[in-house]
């Protein structure tokens, strides 16, 4: 029904059907959607512009033009409104800002209040309240309104409006951006705008207001479609999408289109047609440009041609897809499509292993299944896009689709990018995307600028256009050229502190160096990093990860298991098979890791403990005693145990072996002489210890053998004991099979298997490899040996590299040289002792060993005359070297406990092992044998060895206990009296100079542990704290430390020992680094 020209309630609709390309503009704006062909007189709404309604409205109106310059300029309708036909401009400028009741003559009679609150165009069906409250309530009923019927609140809904409703200005060739909702509008020339505006309740005036991620803010807004003036904006929907890329514009538009009906008077004027029509006219061309940029940014260009579909529900598939998908706009417009499933929109574009661009779904599928997504999964995927999109895309505007452009580009590909495309790998390249996007924007802008906007609209819209163009240029054109190096190719555009666009390289350079990148550093091509191998099948087969070395609770280096080190050999296609292979290879990897663990720990121990772990005199003794045999044997053993351990490591739990290794309480179970006979044979046939004995044997043996019962069995035959106890766990069902072979070898040789040393190294697993050689012959109680077996089986497991063997050999040679020096010293001391100080030997029998019923400590070296007196009782018949080496079995547990936490097991071993040459020479001397083995506290021997190290070559070993005290009953005290300072220093990882401080005063045979700590601290004090001396009680660990007194005394003791040939051999033998020298006097 055409309305009379005076009708204020409705906007004049342009009778002339607009051109197809203008349909969108007319539909979106539906400028005079409800008005008759000639514009009705308008009431200028400008003075009462709703600038006060929402903070955003002010900015919005200011963008268009001054809100209050209605008279000077055509009334500026809020963005959402469609400019009315030019004929209506005069009427629009009508001075009255309020609706006249008389002016609405042709309109159904409405109360003035209603007319004030609602534009007559928003006339609702009878019975609908038009009060502001009702309007507000209706805002929340937008969904309801959309279905209630042709609400006049949205008379201009583009989908509801036919082309006949467009203005004459539509013919000017300026049309609004074909926003998604507008792109598919009907071409209906029906003159009756109201009839066309009125739709059946099924047709929602905001049919395109879908709850997409892009639309939700506006379309799902409660203020949307009911009689609020916001919905009356002609181009509400179109406007919504014009600046989809600009969030601030979106907010402003929302405020524009959904004003709060707070000011009735402003409402009337605000709703008035006059505001929107000129604004709309001026708005169309710039909006087109903006829309062009928007499309270039990624909205799919929509056909402006007439659409055959009448359904408001229909939204162009590509637009719908773009709104719904989270993919960047450029992705849509550049024509990116998944090389696997063909999808053109996806929340995230990924890259396939071959470098092709794939959608998020396909990328995730490949990631989890190591194979491409099947066709069946593709269509069901959420990001599958209708096939029509491609056709539309091809038809849409300038085609910059990746399918054509890369062929024509000159990019060499292979990660060297110049942004022009030309290879299959260019799809997804950021530089190429930038170029495509820029080309699209430029072409859009050119096509838009060809359409001349009406003068009025140009005047109104000019400032916003210039502003937007400036922003557009900055974001589009500027982004394609680095302001620093002027490059147009970069994987990522950044901004400098001034907001200028700079390339990734310049941005990173500035970020790192705080200055702009020199132009000379600019490169013509960008080398892109390939995160995925070029072909999916070519995946690295052997990736040796760096093994992180961690420290466990005991301060022992533990190499974290790196799964998949060997699993890489077979690269299964499915994650399940990969996991299975990883699990299967885990055990063998653990074996290899143990080998690495040992080495790493050896290095750590060398650094941290001053190479004490391997360079100790004890090891030297063993090496010398065994000669080259020890070395070869240790290597043989390492290889053997590595092989055997590799098998066992796979089956036995590494934790068991480790836990068994930890509690090291080595009780000397048999006199050294018992071992001496068998040492050579043991070396000859070094048993390969399987982990079999490691876990179970250690526990069972610990329980089986106590230091008390051990001596008996040890005396009976160490070999049987070894076979039985060390392999005791072989009885365990799980170990039986594994143990059988290795046990056969071990038991086959009556020789005790001197692998107990393995447990010594529990503290530093890495030193095992070396220690295997050195410690072959210090036989710790089977209990310990069990744990050692666990370690030996596991640690060496894995193949030993030739380089490792060579390195071990070099280390052993070095130690042999060091041991030679120690032996020379020991021989000198022994010579002086033989000269006349045999009583010292008598004075220092290892009564501690006797106390427990043990004969000489197991520490006596196998070689030398010591073997000559194998059966001799430790008390009197045992050779001097045996006596020297004897150690109180109870002292050993004590010491091991003390050491278990801080000191490495290798240190403990060192403490226990006697210097070989000294033993040999002493063994030949009956006097020493008669005196009985001197109690060799491991600590004393350790001090001696430490003193004999090359580092301390200038400092002779000084036994704190004077010769007389060696035979003191003080020896009855636990051997813990052995200078513990060495132990403490060991824990600190500092070489204690077993200088005088290391030995307690001559008077205190058994120095208090704290006193020993004091002495040790005293000697370390200079190293750690300079020369500061703590004299007050409580200054250092609560101990008074008369440092000078003790030092001088110990020095004098050492001097007297050296000078007087009558000095007890026990005091001097420590210098020979024979651990048998116990500070404690022999026990009677």
UniProtKB/Swiss-Prot annotation:
Basic residues bias locations: 752-781
Lineage: Eukaryota, Fungi, Dikarya, Basidiomycota, Ustilaginomycotina
SUPFAM superfamilies: Glucocorticoid receptor-like (DNA-binding domain) (SSF57716)
Keyword Transcription belongs to the record: yes
Molecular function GO terms recorded: DNA-binding transcription factor activity, RNA polymerase II-specific; RNA polymerase II cis-regulatory region sequence-specific DNA binding; zinc ion binding
Pfam families in UniProt: GATA
Protein name: Siderophore biosynthesis regulatory protein URBS1
Protein task: Involved in the regulation of secreted ferrichrome-type siderophores. Acts directly or indirectly to repress the biosynthesis of siderophores.
Superkingdom of the organism of origin: Eukaryota
The keyword Zinc belongs to this UniProt entry's keyword annotation: yes
Biased composition (Low complexity): 23-51, 150-164, 1070-1084
Zinc finger GATA-type: from-to: 338-362, 482-506
First-listed, main subcellular location of the protein, grouped into a coarse class: nucleus
Subcellular location field: Nucleus
Region ranges (Disordered): 1-164, 245-283, 300-337, 372-405, 442-472, 559-595, 643-679, 692-803, 841-940, 953-1019, 1040-1084
Cellular component, GO, one term: nucleus
Polar residues: compositionally biased ranges: 97-106, 128-141, 373-385, 961-970
Key words, A-Z: DNA-binding, Metal-binding, Nucleus, Repeat, Repressor, Transcription, Transcription regulation, Zinc, Zinc-finger
Biased composition (Basic and acidic residues): 245-260, 650-659, 715-725, 875-888
InterPro entries per UniProt: Transcription_factor_GATA, Znf_GATA, Znf_NHR/GATA
Swiss-Prot/TrEMBL GO biological process terms: negative regulation of transcription by RNA polymerase II; positive regulation of transcription by RNA polymerase II
């Amino acid at each position: 029904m055409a309305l009379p020209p005076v009708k204020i309630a409705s906007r004049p609709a342009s009778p002339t059907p607009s051109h197809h390309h203008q349909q969108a503009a007319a539909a979106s704006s539906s400028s005079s959607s409800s008005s008759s062909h000639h514009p009705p007189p308008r009431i200028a709404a400008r003075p009462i512009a709703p600038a006060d309604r929402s903070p955003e409205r002010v900015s919005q109106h200011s963008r268009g033009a001054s809100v209050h310059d209605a008279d000077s300029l055509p009334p500026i309708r809020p963005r959402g409104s469609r400019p009315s036909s030019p004929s209506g401009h005069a009427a629009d400028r009508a001075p009255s800002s309020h609706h006249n009741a008389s002016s609405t003559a042709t309109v159904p009679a409405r109360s003035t209040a209603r007319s004030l609150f609602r534009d007559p165009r928003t006339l609702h069906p009878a019975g609908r309240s038009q009060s502001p409250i009702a309007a507000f309530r209706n805002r929340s009923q937008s969904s309801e309104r959309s279905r209630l019927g042709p609400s006049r609140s949205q008379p201009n809904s583009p989908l509801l409006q036919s082309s006949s409703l467009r203005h004459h200005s539509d013919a000017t060739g300026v049309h609004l951006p074909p926003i998604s909702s507008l792109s598919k509008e009907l071409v209906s020339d029906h003159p009756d705008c109201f009839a066309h505006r009125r739709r059946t309740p099924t047709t929602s005036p905001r049919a395109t207001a879908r709850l997409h991620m892009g639309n939700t803010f506006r379309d799902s807004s409660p203020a949307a479609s009911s009689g609020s003036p916001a919905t009356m904006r002609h181009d509400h929907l179109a406007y919504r999408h014009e600046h989809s890329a600009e969030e601030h514009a979106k907010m402003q538009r929302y405020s524009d289109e959904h004003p709060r009906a707070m000011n009735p008077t402003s409402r009337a004027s605000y709703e008035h047609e006059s505001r929107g029509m000129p604004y709309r006219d001026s708005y169309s061309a710039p909006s087109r440009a903006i829309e062009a940029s928007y499309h270039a940014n990624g909205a799919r260009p929509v056909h402006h041609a007439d659409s055959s579909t009448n359904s408001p529900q229909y939204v162009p598939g590509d637009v719908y897809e773009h709104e719904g998908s989270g993919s960047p706009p450029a992705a849509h417009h550049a024509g990116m499509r998944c090389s696997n499933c063909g999808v053109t929109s996806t929340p995230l574009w990924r890259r396939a292993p071959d470098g092709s661009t794939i959608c998020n779904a396909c990328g995730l599928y490949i990631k989890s299944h190591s194979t491409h997504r099947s066709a069946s999964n593709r269509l069901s995927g959420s990001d599958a896009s209708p096939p029509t999109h491609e056709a539309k895309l091809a038809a849409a505007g300038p085609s910059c689709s990746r399918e054509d452009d890369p062929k024509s580009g000159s990019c060499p590909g292979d990660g060297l990018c110049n942004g022009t495309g030309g290879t299959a790998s260019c799809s997804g390249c950021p530089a190429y995307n930038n170029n495509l996007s820029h080309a699209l924007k430029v072409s859009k802008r050119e096509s838009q600028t060809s359409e001349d906007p009406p003068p009025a609209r140009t005047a109104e819209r000019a400032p916003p256009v210039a502003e937007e163009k400036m922003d557009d240029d900055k974001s589009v054109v500027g982004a394609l050229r680095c302001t620093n190096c002027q490059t147009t190719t970069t994987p990522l555009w950044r901004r400098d502190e001034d907001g200028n666009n700079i390339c990734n390289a310049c941005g990173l350079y500035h970020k790192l160096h705080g200055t702009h990148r020199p132009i000379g550093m600019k490169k013509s091509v960008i080398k892109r990093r390939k995160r995925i191998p070029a072909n999916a099948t070519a995946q690295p087969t052997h990736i040796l990860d760096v093994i992180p070395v961690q420290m466990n609770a005991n301060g022992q280096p533990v190499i974290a298991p790196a799964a998949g080190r060997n699993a890489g050999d077979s690269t299964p296609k499915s994650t399940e098979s990969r996991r299975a292979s990883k699990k299967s290879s885990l055990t063998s990897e653990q074996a290899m890791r143990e080998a690495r663990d040992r080495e790493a720990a050896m290095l750590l121990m060398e650094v941290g403990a001053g190479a004490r772990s391997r360079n100790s005199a004890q090891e030297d003794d063993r090496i010398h005693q065994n000669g080259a045999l020890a070395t070869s044997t240790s290597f043989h053993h390492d290889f053997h145990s590595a092989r055997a351990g590799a098998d066992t490591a796979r089956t036995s739990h590494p934790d068991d072996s480790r836990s068994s290794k930890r509690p090291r309480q080595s009780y000397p179970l048999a006199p050294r002489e018992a071992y001496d006979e068998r040492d050579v044979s043991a070396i000859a046939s070094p048993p390969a210890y399987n982990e079999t004995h490691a876990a179970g044997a250690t526990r069972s043996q610990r329980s089986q053998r106590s230091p008390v019962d051990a001596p008996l069995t040890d005396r009976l035959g160490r070999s049987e004991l070894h076979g039985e106890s060390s392999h005791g766990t072989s009885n365990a069902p799980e170990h039986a099979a594994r143990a059988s072979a290795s046990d056969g070898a071990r038991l086959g040789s009556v020789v005790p298997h001197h692998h107990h040393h393995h447990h010594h190294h529990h503290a530093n697993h890495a030193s095992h490899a070396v220690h295997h050689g050195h410690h072959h012959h210090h036989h710790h109680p089977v209990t310990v040996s069990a744990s050692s077996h666990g370690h030996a089986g596991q640690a060496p497991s894995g193949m030993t590299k030739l380089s490792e063997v060579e390195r071990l050999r070099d280390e052993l040679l070095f130690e042999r040289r060091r041991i030679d020096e120690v032996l020379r010293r020991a021989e000198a001391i022994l010579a002086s002792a033989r000269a006349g100080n045999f009583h010292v030997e008598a004075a220092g029998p290892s009564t501690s060993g006797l106390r427990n019923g043990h004969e000489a400590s197991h520490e006596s070296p196998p070689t030398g005359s010591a073997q000559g007196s194998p059966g001799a009782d430790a008390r009197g018949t045992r050779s001097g070297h045996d006596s020297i080496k004897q150690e109180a079995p109870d002292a050993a547990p004590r010491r091991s406990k003390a050491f278990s936490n801080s000191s490495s097991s290798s240190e403990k071993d060192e403490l226990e092992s006697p210097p070989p040459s000294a033993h040999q020479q002493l063994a030949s001397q009956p006097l020493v044998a008669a005196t009985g083995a001197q109690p060799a506290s491991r600590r004393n021997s350790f001090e001696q060895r430490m003193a004999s190290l090359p580092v301390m070559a200038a400092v002779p070993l000084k036994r704190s206990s004077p010769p007389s005290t060696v035979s003191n009953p003080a020896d009855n005290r636990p051997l813990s009296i052995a200078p513990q300072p060495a132990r403490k220093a060991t824990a600190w990882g500092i070489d204690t100079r077993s200088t005088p401080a290391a030995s307690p005063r001559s008077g205190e045979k058994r120095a208090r542990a704290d006193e020993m700590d004091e002495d040790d601290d005293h000697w370390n004090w200079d190293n750690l704290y300079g020369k500061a001396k703590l004299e007050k009680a409580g200054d250092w660990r609560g101990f008074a430390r008369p440092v000078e007194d003790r030092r001088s005394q110990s020095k004098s003791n050492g001097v007297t020992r050296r000078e007087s040939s009558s000095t007890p051999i026990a005091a001097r033998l420590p210098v020979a680094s024979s651990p048998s020298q116990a500070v404690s006097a022999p026990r009677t």
